[in-house]
From Swiss-Prot:
This is Large ribosomal subunit protein bL12. It holds the Pfam family Ribosomal_L12_N. One of its GO terms (biological process) is translation. HAMAP family: Ribosomal_bL12. Homodimer. Part of the ribosomal stalk of the 50S ribosomal subunit. Forms a multimeric L10(L12)X complex, where L10 forms an elongated spine to which 2 to 4 L12 dimers bind in a sequential fashion. Binds GTP-bound translation factors. Forms part of the ribosomal stalk which helps the ribosome interact with GTP-bound translation factors. Is thus essential for accurate translation. Keywords: Ribonucleoprotein, Ribosomal protein. CDD domains: Ribosomal_L7_L12. It comes from Corynebacterium glutamicum (strain ATCC 13032 / DSM 20300 / JCM 1318 / BCRC 11384 / CCUG 27702 / LMG 3730 / NBRC 12168 / NCIMB 10025 / NRRL B-2784 / 534). Belongs to the bacterial ribosomal protein bL12 family.
Length: 128
């Protein structure tokens, strides 16, 4: 296998999407047992700055159904599609018992896709 130079690697990274780069970094971390997170400096970091950094590093999200809205049937169908093995009765109880977590510990892409699907069905959803 030919060895790539740093410049060739940079050019290859420029052609990748952010999602592809994110997946690359995760796989790189697993293969080489390293982490790309920079050490956090404890001194003089403002509370707002610390919260923003924590939000950027978050990789697991909970999709919380806040309100089903007027189109409950569509929301129930969307919940059944998102949560495997959920029957009609369970999905209805979940939707009517809002606010409830629909997905817990989902990655960012799955959480955003679930949020979009539920909002399209008429629900009010938050990611935590």
């Amino acid at each position: 296998m030919a060895k790539l130079t740093k410049d060739e690697l940079i050019e290859a990274f420029k052609e990748m999407t952010l999602i592809e780069l994110s997946e690359f970094v995760k796989e790189f971390e697993e293969v080489f047992d390293v982490t790309a997170a920079a050490p956090v400096a404890v001194a003089a970091a403002g509370a707002a700055g610390g919260e923003a950094a924590a939000a950027e590093e978050k990789d697991e999200f909970d999709v919380v159904l806040e309100d089903a809205g007027a189109k409950k049937i569509g929301v129930i169908k969307a919940v059944r599609e998102l949560v495997s093995g959920l029957g009609l009765k369970e999905a209805k109880e979940l939707v009517e018992g809002a606010p409830k977590a629909i997905l817990e510990g989902a990655n960012k892409d799955d959480a955003e896709a679930a949020k979009a699907k539920l909002e399209e069905a008429g629900a009010k959803v938050t990611l935590k």
